[in-house]
């Protein structure tokens, strides 16, 4: 296996060199390493560091006693960065023999023998057998087969990545239903749909183990969904968490959408705005998907860590922090196309909505997305007025 040395943050590792003619080089290499996910890993360092500080302030525990597991480690880069840059004990697991040997080599390269260990186990077996303060599930594809074991294992925080955005967002409807026991809709807000479907799946799995959750930070970036969930032990916390579950009624004719809380609900089929037939998505998460104060703590951690993507991280976290807690976002260009109107700057639209007495914010999902409590009819009136 031919390798090269790369550096992320303050962590140096050896990674395989993929074949030069590979269509997707990361998956063609003997051990998976995707340089495009450095942004994800930079956010992970800052978010995990922020959560560790919370844990240290709330519990009688030492930093070196906090245990983190990366269930799908491949080269080990994610877990090594947590051990070296956050300073907690990290277990890096992978079923691949090549990955297992490479992780051990990379532990030595970084001198982290006292803070890190490599394991070669089936991820579900490892997570069902051992408990960790922080469980990180970042598989290639769907995390669905591992959520039960991860929910069982996590004491304090559960971090999950999903790269199967087509099933999550409704583009592959039946696959999404099978994997997440939820009906997603492929709408203009499909990225938020995918995030809320994933959060709903996590909430249900945690509830099975008498645990609730508080989403601290969630984002949809490029081809993946990522979330950081504080785990709240106890049946009462689980029951409270499930009260944030529900459905979304969406009218494809006029763009009306409405969240309906509860797992056993009655939803009128007729759209109250235009009389068209609504479509139903869910069950999914309808509560907040980030905590503003935690976002501020993550931003503060950026100053303590030399991250190559620091400014991109800051931009994403700031947008997440400032978003309204309203499902689901609107897309300015989609509405303008429907109306035959010219699109103004997104900030002008936000200001006009606020001037009309409504709440409004941009979102991190796309550059043309916004959230507001204004009815769809009012949104259209304001867009038409702005376009002249």
Curated annotation (Swiss-Prot):
EC numbers for this chain: 2.1.1.216
Domain Trm1 methyltransferase: 4-383
Binding site residues for Zn(2+): 251, 254, 271, 274
Keyword Protein biosynthesis: no
PROSITE patterns to which the protein is assigned, alphabetical: SAM_MT_TRM1
Keywords: Metal-binding, Methyltransferase, RNA-binding, S-adenosyl-L-methionine, Transferase, tRNA processing, tRNA-binding, Zinc
Binding residues annotated for S-adenosyl-L-methionine, in chain numbering: 41, 78, 94, 123
Disulfide bonds: none
Main EC class the enzyme belongs to: transferase
GO MF term set: tRNA (guanine(26)-N2)-dimethyltransferase activity; tRNA binding
Catalytic activity of the protein: guanosine(26) in tRNA + 2 S-adenosyl-L-methionine = N(2)-dimethylguanosine(26) in tRNA + 2 S-adenosyl-L-homocysteine + 2 H(+)
Protein's GO biological process: tRNA N2-guanine methylation
Xref: Pfam families: TRM (PF02005)
HAMAP family: tRNA_dimethyltr_TRM1
NCBIfam families: TRM1 (TIGR00308)
Function: Dimethylates a single guanine residue at position 26 of a number of tRNAs using S-adenosyl-L-methionine as donor of the methyl groups.
Family membership: Belongs to the class I-like SAM-binding methyltransferase superfamily. Trm1 family.
Full protein name: tRNA (guanine(26)-N(2))-dimethyltransferase
Organism: Methanosarcina mazei (strain ATCC BAA-159 / DSM 3647 / Goe1 / Go1 / JCM 11833 / OCM 88)
Lineage: Archaea, Methanobacteriati, Methanobacteriota, Stenosarchaea group, Methanomicrobia
């Amino acid at each position: 296996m031919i390798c090269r040395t790369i550096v992320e943050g303050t962590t140096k590792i050896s990674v395989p060199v993929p074949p030069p003619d590979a269509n997707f080089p990361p998956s063609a290499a003997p051990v998976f390493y995707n340089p495009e996910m450095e942004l994800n890993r930079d956010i992970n360092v800052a978010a995990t560091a922020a959560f560790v500080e919370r844990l240290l302030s709330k519990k009688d525990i030492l930093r070196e006693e906090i245990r983190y597991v990366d269930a799908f480690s491949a080269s080990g880069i994610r877990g090594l960065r947590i051990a070296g840059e956050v300073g907690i004990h990290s277990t890096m697991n992978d079923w691949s023999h090549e990955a297992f040997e490479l992780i051990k080599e990379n532990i030595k390269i970084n001198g982290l023998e006292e803070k890190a260990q490599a394991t070669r186990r089936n991820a579900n077996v490892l997570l069902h057998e051992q408990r960790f303060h922080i469980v990180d599930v970042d598989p290639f594809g769907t995390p669905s087969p591992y959520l039960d074991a991860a929910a069982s294992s996590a004491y304090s925080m559960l971090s999950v990545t999903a790269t199967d955005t087509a099933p999550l967002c409704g583009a592959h409807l039946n696959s999404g239903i099978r994997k997440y026991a939820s009906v997603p809709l492929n709408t203009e807000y499909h990225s938020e749909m995918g995030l809320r479907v994933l959060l709903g799946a996590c909430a249900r799995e945690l509830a099975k183990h008498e645990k609730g959750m508080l989403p601290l930070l969630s984002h949809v970036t490029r081809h993946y969904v990522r979330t950081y969930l504080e785990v709240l032990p106890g049946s009462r916390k689980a029951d409270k968490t499930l009260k944030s579950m529900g459905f979304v009624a969406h009218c494809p004719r006029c763009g009306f959408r409405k969240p309906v809380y509860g797992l056993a609900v009655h939803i009128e089929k007729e759209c109250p705005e235009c009389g068209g037939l609504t479509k139903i998505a869910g069950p999914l998460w309808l509560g907040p998907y980030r905590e503003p104060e935690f976002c501020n703590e993550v931003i503060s951690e950026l100053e303590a860590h030399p991250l190559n993507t620091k400014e991109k991280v800051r931009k994403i976290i700031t947008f997440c922090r400032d978003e309204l807690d309203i499902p689901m976002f609107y897309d300015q260009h989609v509405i303008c196309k429907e109306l035959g109107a010219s699109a103004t700057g997104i900030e002008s639209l936000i200001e006009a909505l606020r001037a009309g007495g409504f709440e409004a914010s941009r979102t991190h999902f796309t550059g043309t997305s916004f959230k507001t409590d204004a009815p769809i009819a009012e949104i259209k009136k304001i867009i038409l007025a702005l376009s002249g």
